[in-house]
A protein has these predicted regions:
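Conserved aromatic anchor
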Residues: 173-193
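Beta-strand-rich modules
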Residues: 238-260
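Recognizes extended acidic, P/S/T-rich segments that occur
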Residues: 81-116, 198-241
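Solvent-exposed N-terminal domain segments of exported/luminal and surface proteins
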Residues: 28-120
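Extracellular fibronectin type III
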Residues: 142-143, 255-290
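Short, solvent-exposed loop/linker segments at the N-terminal edge
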Residues: 59-60, 169-177
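Bacterial N-terminal signal peptides
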Residues: 8-17
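Bacterial Sec-dependent N-terminal signal peptides
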Residues: 17-41, 284-293
Length: 293
């Protein structure tokens, strides 16, 4: 995530905008209008339980994350993006634009916040109704309420590295060989009864200078994204540089609710992300990070 929000969703329920939205808002799809994904691939809100995995495989709790995000399609445009909090009354916060330097994922409008405990997270981001409002490049106003419900987080994944069909230490990654990243089965994962999107798995790797030099893909942006059925993700030989330190995460995301809003998907999850640092073997590549100041 850094704070790593990418598609870690919380429980999301889409309600009709009437009766809970700001005045003079346009409800998408009320008269059969189809907007589609030319500007926005999807949007939603989430809560994520985050842990750091140590070299011995143990996990350290590093707190929780709330986020609200609008994922912008390539060449798309979003303006006037905000989210109305359930309390205090009239608490409307702007979503900020964030450009992605990665070739793997696109830009977002976002808001995020951290907490040490679930109770603190719920105090700062109550499990109640939030209202997304934004304007697409085509001039359509999306105005939809989302509501958090009381559900459990996914079980925290454990990250396992394998090369040449052998489990390896996280400081012994050979960059000239395919790296197989795996994890225990995502047993809580399930197919989506609505047929919109099944529960998801994400894998991402950051270098010291660029986030997401590797990303398993977000739905609607990459065809071969991972669902709960996936057992591994392969980083091809030559992707990583020798003699470098990288950071990564594996996330298991339960999509508790899925909807299609005038052709724009909206989801939510309670997700579990495990972060880990690892090193590649070999002499330091001159194109790598080198000694940091």
């Amino acid at each position: 995530m850094q704070i790593r929000a990418y598609l870690a969703w919380a429980i999301l329920v889409i309600f009709p905008a009437a009766g809970c939205s700001p005045d003079n808002a346009t409800e998408p799809g009320v008269s059969g209008e189809y907007i589609g994904q030319d500007d926005v691939t999807f949007f939603g809100a989430g809560k994520v339980a985050r842990y750091q995995q140590q070299s011995d495989g143990s996990l350290e709790n590093i707190g929780l994350l709330f986020f609200a995000e609008i994922f912008i399609a390539a060449g798309g445009e979003v303006t006037d993006a905000s989210i109305q909090f359930p309390q205090p009354a009239g608490d409307i916060r702007d979503l900020l634009y964030r450009h992605s330097e990665s070739d793997e994922i696109g830009d977002v409008m976002y808001l995020s916040g951290n907490a040490d405990t679930v109770d603190e997270l719920d105090r700062n981001f109550p499990p109640a109704e939030y209202v997304f409002k934004f304007t697409t490049g085509s001039g359509n106003i999306i105005n939809q309420a989302v509501s958090f419900n009381d559900r459990k987080f996914a079980k925290q994944p454990i990250i396992i590295f394998r090369q040449n069909e052998q489990t390896i230490a996280t400081d012994q990654v050979d960059p000239t060989v395919d790296l197989v990243i795996t994890w225990p089965p995502f047993t809580e994962g399930r197919a989506d009864a609505n047929g919109v999107l099944d529960d998801l798995i994400f894998v991402a790797i950051d270098s010291c200078t660029v986030e997401d030099i590797v990303h398993s893909g977000r739905p609607f942006e990459k065809d071969d994204y991972l669902t709960f059925r996936a057992k591994e993700y392969v980083v091809s030989a030559g992707t990583l540089l020798p003699g470098q330190e990288y950071s990564m995460y594996v996330e298991h995301a339960i999509l508790a609710d899925t909807h299609d809003v005038a052709g724009i998907p909206a989801f939510a999850t309670l997700a579990a992300s495990t972060y880990m640092d690892f090193k590649t073997t070999g002499a330091e590549d001159p194109n790598g990070c080198g000694e940091q100041p």
